[in-house]
Amino acid sequence: EAKKPCVHIEREDDPAKQVRRYGFTAGLKISVLSNFEHLYIYDTSYPVEQNDTRLKAIVREYKYTDYEDAAEELLEYLGKESVYSGHFDEVWSEIEANVNHKSVDELFLQQINNWRLMLGKEILNCNPEIEMEELGDVVQSYINKILFLRVCEDRNIETYQSLLQIADHNSYQELIAKFKAADSRYNSGLFEEKLSAEIIGNVSSSFWSIIRELYFPQSPYSFAVLSSDILGKIYEIFLSQRLAVVDGQLSIVNKPENEDRDIVTTPNFIVREILRQTMRDNLAHLTDEQILSLKCADIACGSGAFLLETFQILCDALVDFYTVNDKSKLIQTDVNTFKLKFEIKRNVLKSCIYGVDKDFNAVEACKFGLLLKLLEGEDDSTIASFHPVLPNLDDNIFYGNSLLESSDVPDNQVEEINPFDFGERKFHYIIGNPPYMKTEDIKVFTPKEHKLYPKRYKSAYKQYDKYFLFVERAFKLLKKDGAMGYIVPSKFMKVGAGRELRNYISSNKSIKAITSFGAHQIFSDKSTYSCIIILQNKENDSFTYSEVDSLAKWKVRDLTSFSENKRNISHLGKETWVLCSDRLQSILNHISTQSLPLGEIVGDDYIFNGIQTSANKEYIFQPESEDRQYYYFKYNKQLYQIEKKITKPYFKTVSGVDSLNTYRTFKPNARVIFPYKRRTDGKLDVIKLSTIQRKFPYFYNYLRVIKSELDRPDRDIKPAPTTANEWHRFGRHQSLEACEIAEKIIVGVLAQENKYAVDTNGT
């Protein structure tokens, strides 16, 4: 932030607060304030408070007389070479930790959730009959309205503090009038009435609180620099939760499909890299007409992170084209710096950007983010001639289930499943981070959809993951020569369930590139082995395979950070894909010529997965205590006891750590309830319920508690039960006999290193 020399930043507090608010809102480690005589570097990883002085959060300060002696230091802290080499991140790594722990998105999400509860409680008090789903929609709608107008104030599109004046007047009539005027001016559907007079008139106190919290000092943010991608991250987490009445109180709870897992957002560097590989490098060769004719989609768009960046890339490509060919289409903002005219940006959004999501609130959040993105860099003067200012995005961002079409769904399930018909629509580019969901979870959360997927998708094979289906669906929606870019777990290349997806991709010869991140963790607090896969709707003889060695260097495009190798597509098929760098490939080839597959030595029947209960929460426990006959354990916070003889030792990883060591024995760390008995021929049969009641009464009592979980219609048991009294069986029968073998070698699935532990406990 550069100030005139007459602004005394060396003694005034406001310039320091301003630059810190800008930096904090933008999610930056540091921000620089200078009036040319003085230069200050501020830590902007935590919010500004009203009584902060200019000295708060200052980490470096220089006077112009220091510049010569401090030149090397300044270049290290702020220099272009430092940033591009990645050294900048190392220099400010301590502050980076603060950014991650006290980030703007976490604080703002907490504030938005407080508003949801405050507004929701007052609306519920006035209208007790309102459905929870409608309540959530109405609350989100009003928060969007207020937030949109507040952002427009800081961007000089709306009069600054106009909302605050309404709050100070305590006039709900003025607020309704403001919304109506905004609806007339912007006309994007954002300001459509949702019970406005009824709600605003009765709960205006909540609106005044929300509005006041959007201004300093109650708000630490500068909405002029609140980027759409940061807002998108906030909404991505926001969308994983819903309003619900719990024990008589309105609360925010996870949506059912998110109850047992963390919601992660796609890092910006991954979004940008997928778009670079999929489309950006091609745009330099296109004319403006060709760029404006592109159709780009995310068919599981969420809050729109990929679409926001796609819109930006298309606008940047047009600026590059017009800078060389027709500067009359541009507005000059500085020396050799230009931006697109608003009309052309508007055209890009309406003509090129498309999205689908099965969550209605995600659709609304995506539209909201795109409209704010459209207004970035604009002010009242650049949009004054447009009426309405904003386009309606109802024909761009759709509410529906993109995996199923109407013809796939029985008539009596259409409303619940909400299939989306793409019709003749095809796309030049499809990008995204599709949902990851195991088959077991699909059965639990969307059992009706689960039955329909195998009819449409070849990749719906065995224990498939939902992202398999999205890869197949996206590829089918590409125009000729179109491209798809996704980040997905890399396990599809290895696991048996990925066999048909591998076959589908390889038989179409569609691979353009695969970037493997190996053990590098892309998503914070989430252990997932990820890769970027780029497919083209054309036949390729070869593809580029890359392995990332250093994630930090790869982020800044340091070519030494990854190996790039050409691979022949004909070498891939439905069997496991073994992909590695050229250096490792030669080692692997040497090992292969000197070795035999394990199956040839011990027999394929003796290589097996562990047991699959399909009810781990109910059947696997870690004892709280034990005596000679019983184990004591907790289930849903209640203490139970169970006969030791009906359990077996079990090993489970804890927080991703497997504690296995090669050639060493290990101790099981849990117990599994094992309701099976051995026959004379060595096979296992499930123990009848009547026998359990007689021989294992404590287990029988516990079974009665968990029956509702084990006997769910969507719980998949194979082979299918032959009687109504086999609901306590495991989900899969294979490997049960093998698991009783006294001595075994155990290796973790997708292990990062060679760990072959020895089991002597019958685990």
Name the predicted role of every residue range.
Residues E1-C6, Y22:
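Conserved catalytic cores of phosphodiester-cleaving nucleases, focusing on short active-site segments
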Residues K4, I30, F468, F475-K476, ...:
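Polybasic, glycine- and aromatic-enriched phosphate-binding surface used to engage nucleic acids
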Residues E12-L33, H38-E96, N100, N156-E158, ...:
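Signature of N6-adenine DNA methyltransferases within the class I
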Residues E37, L75-C315, C352-A362, G400-E405, ...:
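Preference for the N-terminal adenyl/adenosyl cofactor-binding alpha/beta module
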Residues H38, L239, C301, F360, ...:
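Short, glycine-/Ser/Thr-/acidic-enriched flexible segments
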Residues N51, T159-D168, L286-S293, L314-V348, ...:
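Flexible phosphate/Mg2+-sensing switch loops adjacent to catalytic phosphate-binding sites
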Residues E129, F517-I522, R732-Q734:
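Short, solvent-exposed loop/turn elements at beta->coil junctions and helix N-caps
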Residues S303-L308, Q312-C315, K367-L371, N701, ...:
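Phosphate-binding glycine-rich loops of NTP-binding sites
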